[in-house]
Regions:
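Intrinsic-disorder-associated, low-complexity terminal segments enriched in Asp/Asn/His/Tyr and depleted
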Residues: 2-4, 21
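Compositionally biased, low-complexity flexible segments
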Residues: 9-10
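Non-catalytic structural scaffold of enzyme domains
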Residues: 28-298
Length: 298
């Protein structure tokens, strides 16, 4: 059973009737599974960009978030290592009875998606297809830049997705930006060092006359104000958070998994290191209290 869902939910999700039979109650009604949480995971704080979009689009849904803050960044690690970490986190979330998994990490989506889907009996959403579709919808010239971690860039996952969806005429220019993730994790969202790094990374891309830039790591939207200043008003910045939230809503509706409860949603955050730093950055970004942060050890 292959449970990976692309941005359209077409062609990549086999066995949907089997899954529907397992998660619907007898007679087609909604089972208690509908009140189960959505599991969202990333290498660190960056996946909160997706959490925020899901909270806004699906305000009744319970969410469990896992940020692997002890082992961030993932983008400079080998595919085998990333796959091993992804398997650990997937099993952690499945043990907590999530009804949907959202891979809010471009590196894991690029190099470990098969590992995740092989383990999961619930639908799996990922960010790369959604980000590619969002960029193509925004671009007028089909000249699209991609910034991401070294692992994501090396995988060519975005280039493949853009050309599969938009055709071979799509022009792409890509740049690995390994320092952005640690800068975001440090909370240096408007620090002089971050400005210098951004100008160094983005200068060669701007010379390619792009009209759209994919923020190909879920950490990068936290730098959106700074990056917008660096690239200027003629370049549209695109990420996948909103598109993933929309697709999550569609999947829950399709399988009768929308939470019917009128109770306030429960948000739980699990991290592997520095919970106080995670709290500081996370509350600033989400604009709401983060009352339940738990430290986990693997």
């Amino acid at each position: 059973l292959h449970k990976h869902l692309d941005g359209r939910g077409e062609g990549r999700f086999k066995g949907s009737a089997f899954v529907r039979d397992r998660i619907r109650g007898k007679g087609g009604g909604v089972s208690s599974t509908a009140t189960h949480p959505i599991g969202i995971f990333d290498s660190g704080v960056g996946g909160l960009t997706v959490v925020r979009a899901v909270m806004e689009r699906l305000p009744r849904e319970n969410i469990i978030y896992f940020g692997d803050t002890a082992r961030v960044p993932y983008g400079v690690k080998s595919p085998d290592t990333v796959a091993r970490y992804a398997a650990q986190i997937t099993n952690f979330l499945l043990a907590r009875s999530v009804k949907l998994l959202v891979v809010a990490c471009n590196t894991m989506a690029a190099v470990a998606l098969d590992t995740i889907t092989a383990l999961s009996p619930v639908p799996v959403l990922e960010v790369i297809d959604a980000g590619a579709r969002s960029a193509l919808a925004a671009s007028k010239t089909k000249r699209i830049g991609i910034i991401a971690t070294p692992s994501t860039i090396a995988s060519q996952a975005y280039v493949v997705a853009l050309r599969r969806i938009g055709g071979p005429e799509v022009f792409t220019a890509a740049r690995a930006c390994p320092l952005f993730v640690p800068l975001v994790e440090e909370g240096w969202l408007d620090h002089p060092a971050t400005w210098l790094v951004a100008e160094e990374y983005l200068g060669p891309l701007l010379a390619e006359h792009l009209d759209t830039l994919i923020l190909g790591c879920t950490h990068y939207p936290l730098l959106r104000p700074l990056l917008g200043e660096v690239v200027g008003p003629d370049v549209r910045l695109q990420d996948s958070a909103t598109a993933v939230a929309e697709r999550a809503a569609a999947i829950l509706a399709e399988f009768g998994l929308e939470n019917p409860s009128a109770d306030p949603p429960r948000y739980t955050y699990h991290v592997t290191d520095m919970p106080h730093r995670f709290l500081e950055i996370g509350q600033r970004f989400l604009g709401r209290p983060m009352d339940d942060i738990r430290l986990e050890r693997f």
